[in-house]
């Protein structure tokens, strides 16, 4: 538990005008801290030095009140501090203070300096080239996107309200996807209305595309839609109930084969013939879709972040599509049968359909279990829990962003064709560290940061509304967003009245509670209640904002693929290395249990389940870490069954790494910058297949490295179940 000395009381009679135009109460403690920080760099802070510093602070405050009794600007305070230091002949202290202040001013300028940003990219700064583990920074189209991104980020920071830009640069908040927005009025992620587009046709480029007459054509069209949608937004795209969407086109294949059979096949064999041919068509079509998605590159310089939801279909075409999706994933990609990273597979469990032994689709659940033990996907949704948490059933947009239940003007439930307008994440651990163990101070700073986040989110909405249908025809004019607008119509009609969501993100509840209650707080009811109060307070606020602005503000448990690194790195610079908080070099995602500890899967789920229930239902996922499960799928089934009534969305993390030199299969060992075969030491991405859960999606960290903080977090994970992490030990490799 961190205990810090009592801090000075802010002066409520004097206001400070910040660089971004905000007015805040003058706080003497900030001057005191700045001088102590400078002193620690240039001298031993003895009791005598403490007394000198105290006297200096008194003089500075007296001078400020004398010259600026009503209000003072930041630069005026800094000038007085420098003058008093020089007057007192504290030259070393003055030099350090001035150097630090100048450096801060320089850092602020660099963030909006396009030339500096391009320089970082050309020098392959890790924070730039590895920010997104799905982007291969060695290839030309990604390099072009990264170049455009640093330009967009620099311009975007200048477009943001000053106090929002300042809070982002300091690390108080994170305005996500600055490389795309607000420079362009793009949307984030969505559930594509594939059903409407396939039924009614659409247009891409110069081609008018009619409704498909076969499942092969349908999946080909879907891959083209995905490529175009992913190039028109910056977040992930999902297909909800893809088995049910594609089944009518598989039935067209069946009817065609049945008609052909009338000419060539005996009457009693015609249906069998048509069904066998249709099964092959379904398999080939779904295999083509998997390969298409994994070979697509969008204008964003990456494979589209794509998720396929399935599992609720019951007729034979729907069931066959479900089985094909799973069998194709089990088989793997290419001659080496590598694990496909995309699309993310999301299988729905439902009581009475596939959950229990004896239910109609229980056999497909068994296939899903086999697939998860071998390829980690599918993740699973608990149908009834998703309805409870979000108001209706749907798959997440991208990896974890959930729409809330919504009905149109005719009272019809609508999910596909809806979208998210962006995310702003608050750095909760920083608030805890700044509060120095004072809970009242925590809530005071928390309130201030929530106000900034509100302004940032409202700006996201307003900027997105400035798009025109012509900016993204596939989204607004040709059906991906569910309605087909004219070129001059307002896109806001697809966003307002809570049709779209806008997300308030958060990170690091573990670290927050650690500041106040110590690092083993998980079984402390007071500590857990405190973390739940944070979620409840955020929930209260987003409901008020939704009522005020007319858009659905939701709480989002941020994936933090690179933010886990950025926030922790900035806070290490600000507060130093603090045990169990910044010394780990990463912050824990959202409400997740400390990854370094090993509760059972059941204990972990029981601990985490209350956070989405408390309000974090706009985006969430739970994981459990397992040993090799391929010989024990029943162990995984026990967790899935236990989770069904407790959590809505569950992922499987299990060792599936492979070395093609020595044939080792299991868990690779973390190295300083990646992973290596524990048998022969091989780390060549050409001859290994390393698959780790990066955040909501899987990643291949040897082929596409991730930022340092995420790598540290993955390396720190421990298993939640006993068992071997080796499937095949591998043989000796002679050089």
Where are each of the predicted segments found?
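Contiguous, well-ordered alpha-helical segments that form the cores/surfaces of helical PPI scaffolds
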Residues: 244, 502-515, 536, 693
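Short, intrinsically disordered, low-complexity segments enriched in Ser/Thr and Pro
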Residues: 47-48, 539-547, 719-735
């Amino acid at each position: 538990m961190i205990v810090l000395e009592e801090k000075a009381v802010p002066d409520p009679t004097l206001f400070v005008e910040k660089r971004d135009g905000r007015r805040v109460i003058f706080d003497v403690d900030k001057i005191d801290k700045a001088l102590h920080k400078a002193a620690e760099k240039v001298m031993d802070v003895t009791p005598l030095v403490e007394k000198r510093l105290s006297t200096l602070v008194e003089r500075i405050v007296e001078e400020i009140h004398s010259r600026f009794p009503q209000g003072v600007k930041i630069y005026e305070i800094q000038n007085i501090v420098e003058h008093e230091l020089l007057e007192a002949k504290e030259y070393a202290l003055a030099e350090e203070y001035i150097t630090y202040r100048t450096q801060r001013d320089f850092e602020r300028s660099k963030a909006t300096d396009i030339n500096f940003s391009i320089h970082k990219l050309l020098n392959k700064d890790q924070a730039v080239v590895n920010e997104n583990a799905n982007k291969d920074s060695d290839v030309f189209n990604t390099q072009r996107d990264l170049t455009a991104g640093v330009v967009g980020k620099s311009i975007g920071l200048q477009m943001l309200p000053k106090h929002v830009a300042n809070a982002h640069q300091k690390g108080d908040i994170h305005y996500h996807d600055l490389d795309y927005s607000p420079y362009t009025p793009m949307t984030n992620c969505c559930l594509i209305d594939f059903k409407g587009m396939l039924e009614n046709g659409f247009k891409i480029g110069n081609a008018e595309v009619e409704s498909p007459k076969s499942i092969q054509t349908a999946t080909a069209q879907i891959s083209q839609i995905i490529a175009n949608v992913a190039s028109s937004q910056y977040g992930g795209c999902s297909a909800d109930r893809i088995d049910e969407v594609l089944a009518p086109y598989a039935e067209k294949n069946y009817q065609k084969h049945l008609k052909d059979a009338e000419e060539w096949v005996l009457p009693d064999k015609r249906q069998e013939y048509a069904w066998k041919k249709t099964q092959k068509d379904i398999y080939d079509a779904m295999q083509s879709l998997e390969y298409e998605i994994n070979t697509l590159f969008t204008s964003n310089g990456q494979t589209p972040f794509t998720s396929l939801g399935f599992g609720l279909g019951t007729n034979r075409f729907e069931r066959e599509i479900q089985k094909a999706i799973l069998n194709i994933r089990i088989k793997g990609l290419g001659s080496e049968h590598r694990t496909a990273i995309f699309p993310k597979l999301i299988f729905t469990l439902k009581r009475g359909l596939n959950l229990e032994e004896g239910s109609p689709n229980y056999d497909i659940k068994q296939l899903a279990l086999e697939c998860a033990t071998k390829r980690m996907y599918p993740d699973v949704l608990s149908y009834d829990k998703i309805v409870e948490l979000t108001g209706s059933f749907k798959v997440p947009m991208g990896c974890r962003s959930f729409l809330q239940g919504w009905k149109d003007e005719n009272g019809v439930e609508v999910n596909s064709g809806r979208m998210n307008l962006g995310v702003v994440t608050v750095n909760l651990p920083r608030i805890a560290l700044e509060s120095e163990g004072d809970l009242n101070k925590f809530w005071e700073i928390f309130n201030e940061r929530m106000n900034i986040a509100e302004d940032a989110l409202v700006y996201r909405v307003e900027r997105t509304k400035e798009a025109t249908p012509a900016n993204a025809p596939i989204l607004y004019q040709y059906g991906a967003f569910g309605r087909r607008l004219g070129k001059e119509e307002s896109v806001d009609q697809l966003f307002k009245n809570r049709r779209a969501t806008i997300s308030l993100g958060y990170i690091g509840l573990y670290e927050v509670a650690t500041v106040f209650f110590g690092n083993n707080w998980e079984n402390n009811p007071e500590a857990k209640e405190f973390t739940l109060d944070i979620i409840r307070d955020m929930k209260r606020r987003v409901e008020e904002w939704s009522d005020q602005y007319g858009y659905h503000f939701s709480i989002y448990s941020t994936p933090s693929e690179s933010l886990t690194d950025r926030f922790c790195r900035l806070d290490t610079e600000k507060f130093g290395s603090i045990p169990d908080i910044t010394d780990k070099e990463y912050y824990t995602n959202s409400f997740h249990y400390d990854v370094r500890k090993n509760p059972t899967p059941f204990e972990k789920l029981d601990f985490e389940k209350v956070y989405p229930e408390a309000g974090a239902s706009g985006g969430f996922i739970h994981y459990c870490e397992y040993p090799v499960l391929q010989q024990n799928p029943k162990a995984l089934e026990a967790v899935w069954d236990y989770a069904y009534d407790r959590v809505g969305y569950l992922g499987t993390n299990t060792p599936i790494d492979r070395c093609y030199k020595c044939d080792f299969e299991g868990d690779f060992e973390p190295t300083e910058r990646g992973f290596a075969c524990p048998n022969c030491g091989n780390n060549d991405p050409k001859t290994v297949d390393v698959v780790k859960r990066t955040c909501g999606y899987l990643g291949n960290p040897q082929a596409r490295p991730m930022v340092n903080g995420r790598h540290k977090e993955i390396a720190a994970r421990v298993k939640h179940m006993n068992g071997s992490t080796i499937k095949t030990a591998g043989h000796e490799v002679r050089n």
